[in-house]
Amino acid sequence: MKISKNEEEIYQYMRIHQFHTLFSFHVLPYVELHSFQTKEMICSEGNALPYLYYLISGRAKIYMSHKNGKVSLINFIQAPSFIGELGLIGVENITKSVEVLEDCVCLALPLKDCQQLLLQDATFLQHLCKFIGEKTITRTENYAKNYSYPFENRLAAFILLTEQNNCYIEKHTEASEYLNVSYRHLLYVLNRFCQQNYLRKEGRTYYIQDRNTLEKLADELKI
């Protein structure tokens, strides 16, 4: 992780992404710029997150571990998005892991300096309520799609969502659980995608060969 406190640089990012409009107080003195590379952890499970993050570029995934050793893939984050908002308002006591899929840049607000300002800012809370509501709707729609569309369409969308530099490398156990299919069926369809030249497998990595077809399959899920 790289941290910048350069006010001129931060101001430019704030202006481009209209970050200042989310607050009624002068937020610039508190903001830091945090950059994360692929595979870095924005947040590790169980560790308190000392910042409220606003993701302005990049992608990340959220997952959690269980007492039996299994790991569950929960959701994906794409810009623009808050990270750590549930901890801020006190409804999530144990943080989940957030891992970078594609280099991420975040505007960061240190909670030790401005948590009370945030919780007392009606403008910010209105924006936060809208964000949480939209996120809830998206998760509900994704859950419904898992039971309403053929697996080929859902897998194509999942591959495009998680691919890194044209490579798909997600663990089969996590992917099958997230997509609500058996491990065996996941492997069967991945193999069929390779036979149809949508993908090419080398070792444990799948390389995207026919992005257009995958995009057409994934587009069926769009509402």
Show where each model-derived region lies.
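Cyclic nucleotide-binding regulatory module and flanking cytosolic helices
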Residues: M1-T38, I83, G87-L88
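Phosphate-/nucleic-acid-contacting segments
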Residues: Y149, F158-I223
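Short beta-strand segments in beta-sandwich/barrel cores
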Residues: E32, M41, R59-M64, F82, ...
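Cyclic-nucleotide recognition modules
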Residues: L73-K130
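Polybasic "coupling" helices that flank or enter modular domains
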Residues: L101, L118-R184
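Glycine- and acidic-residue-biased ligand/ion/polar-headgroup-sensing regions
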Residues: P50-I62, A79-P80
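A cytosolic small-molecule/anion-sensing beta-strand core signal
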Residues: Q37-T38, I56-S57, Q78, E102
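Short phosphate-coordinating micro-motif centered on Lys-Gly-acidic
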Residues: I42-N47
